[in-house]
């Protein structure tokens, strides 16, 4: 990837996230009553990623309920390694998530993936998973937030909590039947509003 392409992709992502933040306050239809989320104590920290897919992930972002203060973004991450181990995206500051696990909390996760078509050309696509639950974690010893990207356009969000034998150990690949894995779909809205670069 050329230096210009990296700069262009970074600028495009920053623009998309800025526009999405601005668009959040615009009324687009009839007024609908909204349940305001309860205020919870938040922690801020790095977000990391593991990629078990064969596709490069340019970036991703987590969105909590409106006005909750919950959300953040994550790093780019290379495709799965030839030896079957996931690639890791280093820490990116700062994501805000509840200090204590909230079972009712639902997030939206959006990510930009570079996939190859049958003709070999690379195409970027925005994906999203809605109603994503964070895997349960113990408060008091939380560490980094992790987005784990799995084959089939799936994602799992977790916080490390010091329990190396529990379900929040980034060294362990989540089981395919893990109830905290969310299915992603092509994000038609963001692909239309913020078209990714193509070869």
Q: Predicted segments — roles?
A:
Residues 23-26:
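Bacterial signal peptide processing site
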Residues 18-21:
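C-terminal motif of bacterial Sec signal peptides marking the signal peptidase cleavage site
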Residues 62-117:
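Tryptophan-paired
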Residues 102-199:
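Beta-strand-rich cores of mature extracytoplasmic or soluble domains
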């Amino acid at each position: 990837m050329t230096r210009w392409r990296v700069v262009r992709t970074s600028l495009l992502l920053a623009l998309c996230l800025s526009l999405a933040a601005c668009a959040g306050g615009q009324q687009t239809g009839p007024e609908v009553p909204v349940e305001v989320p309860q205020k919870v104590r938040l922690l801020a920290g790095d977000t990391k990623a593991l990629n078990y897919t064969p596709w490069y992930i340019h970036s991703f972002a987590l969105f909590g309920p409106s006005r909750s203060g919950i959300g953040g973004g994550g790093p780019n991450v290379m495709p799965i390694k030839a030896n079957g181990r996931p690639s890791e995206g280093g820490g990116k500051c700062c994501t805000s998530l509840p200090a204590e696990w909230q079972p009712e909390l639902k997030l939206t996760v959006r990510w930009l993936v570079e996939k190859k078509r049958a003709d070999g050309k690379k195409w970027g696509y925005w994906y999203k998973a809605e109603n994503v639950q964070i895997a349960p974690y113990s408060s008091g010893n939380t560490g980094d937030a992790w987005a784990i990207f799995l084959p089939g356009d799936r994602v799992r969000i977790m916080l490390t909590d010091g329990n190396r034998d529990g379900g929040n150990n980034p060294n362990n690949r989540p089981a395919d039947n893990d109830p905290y894995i969310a299915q992603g779909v092509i994000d038609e809205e963001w692909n239309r509003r913020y078209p990714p670069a193509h070869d």
